Amino acid sequence: SGVILDQYWNYVKKKKIKFNLAVSNTHLLNNFGYSKSDIIKDGFKIDDEIFMTLDGYNDVTMAKSLAIFGQSFSDLLNRVRPDWVVLAGDRGETFMASVISAYMNIPIAHIQAGELSGNIDGQARHAIGKFAHLHFASNIDAAKRLEKLGEQKFRIQNLGAPQLDDMQNTQKILIAQKKLEKKFVEISKINYALCIFHPVVEEYQRTKKNYSILHNFLKKHVKFRIWISPNSDSGSNIIKDSFNKLRDSNDLLIDNLPRFEYISLLKNCDFIIGNSSSGIIESASFKKPCINIGRRQKNRFSVRNVVNIEVINYR
């Protein structure tokens, strides 16, 4: 399960707060790793499952999938009637959950509010912020932005990025690394790039070209590449199909990993490349270089280990 879920669970147990856990989207899909099983293994009880993702993975199916989520989520809230809805990040289903919650007059707490990014997720994050009642920012830049956007100061708390707390848990990382090496490859004995390239909704027509340029560049310059599957946004099927056509014996694709197994991958890599927020937020904890490509994380708050490339242009 994700770090945010772990920390939230520890808090509500301590405070003896009852909560309802709903999982959706790729957590329930076999072709995206079926991470629901990881949530259960970590000891969480899943109260509701919201199936939403239509096949096709284009702009139309993505929009319809969000509409399906909205219908199901409103039924869930009507049945449970919680005192609060806790949302994290900037995903489309998170945005839909904020809209439904607000219109059903249920207060919203938003984790990692106020950050910038360059694609539709960034727009969703700020839209969620306008529906939310409590804003948990991950840095002072985001906290100040929330205030400039008109949110009341007493509602804003700068709590830091929750992902970073796990970076110092060396024992769990080492145990997870041993599990990962049994399943895939002995990462401690090879040099590799950690590659994560998600589709960009606004650049759907260029997905194949952009991904192919990146993959071919890495094949030429990096001996071993470990890839994490893209998310389910429109264009994800194009990336997966392109990977299968371009891959060779030095490419490894992993659909889903438990949290600490992923951290062990990040800790041992030579560098991380692509357009994932993990490179922006987490890689500096291990002093790993991050090559951030394109608009998806554009203007995201980052430190000196991140190199931003505006446009993929390789001959």
Language-model segment annotations:
Residues 39, 175-268:
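Donor-nucleotide binding loops and adjacent catalytic segments primarily
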Residues 18-25, 135-136, 224-231:
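Short internal beta-strands
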Residues 1-14, 52-153, 158:
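Active-site and donor-binding regions of nucleotide-sugar-utilizing enzymes
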Residues 15-62, 72:
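Conserved nucleotide-sugar phosphate-binding/catalytic loop shared by glycosyltransferases and other
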Residues 47-51, 137, 157-159, 252-256, ...:
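Short acidic-hydrophobic, aromatic-tinged amphipathic segments that line or gate anion-handling sites
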Residues 28-31, 131-209:
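A nucleotide-sugar donor-handling region in carbohydrate enzymes
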Residues 87-88, 95, 99, 110-111, ...:
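A donor-sugar binding/catalytic signature common to diverse glycosyltransferases
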